[in-house]
A protein has these predicted regions:
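Conserved acetyl-CoA-binding loop of GNAT-fold acetyltransferases
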Residues: 133-143
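Flexible loop/turn segments at secondary-structure boundaries
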Residues: 33, 80-84, 127-130
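Conserved acetyl-CoA-binding loop-helix of GNAT-fold acetyltransferases
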Residues: 90, 96-109, 134
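Conserved GNAT acetyl-CoA-binding A-motif
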Residues: 111-124
Length: 154
């Protein structure tokens, strides 16, 4: 299976369609260490690094899903590259509840109101592409060049 970049037409999305019983918040700097710790514990250090890039801005581009004052998911945009969405993660116990889609849409809304017309979701596995198509109508970019090829360990 190969990874593809995906394209999202932000003009074609309905940002009011998300209704879940979980709160989604834009990360504030006093919470950034908690978010980085959560991501490192549940996902990966590289995702935690990407989230740091999204949080340490005047206008943070990282959102968290919160249930009973506990972080249960996160998503970022403009972290690794401008106009790119990701990473996205939801705690195992909270999957299949629409939280991932809600986080995707919150970031897509952020991208739209930050002036973007389109978003790119980088390096998506074939297995995960259906999730993004269902969440935000993301389609593969044929022959896309991968931003992650610039990683030091590649």
């Amino acid at each position: 299976m190969s990874n593809n970049d995906l394209l999202v037409d932000l003009y074609d999305l309905d940002f009011s369609s998300i209704d879940i019983p979980i709160t989604i918040k834009r990360v504030l700097s006093p919470n950034s260490d908690d978010v980085v710790e959560y991501i490192g514990k549940h996902f990966s250090p590289k995702w935690a690094s990407e989230a740091k890039a999204a949080m340490y801005k005047n206008h943070p581009t990282c959102f968290v899903a919160v249930d009973n004052k506990e972080i249960v998911g996160f998503a970022c945009y403009d972290a690794t590259a401008k106009g790119f969405f990701g990473p996205l993660g939801v705690s195992d116990d909270y999957r299949k509840r629409g939280i991932g889609k809600a986080l995707v849409m919150k970031c897509m809304e952020g991208l739209f109101y930050d002036g973007y017309g389109y978003a790119i979701i980088g390096g998506v596995s074939e297995k995960t592409q259906k999730f993004y198509y269902d969440a935000c109508k993301a389609i593969p970019i044929v022959n896309s060049r991968k931003v992650y090829n610039r990683l030091i360990d590649r």
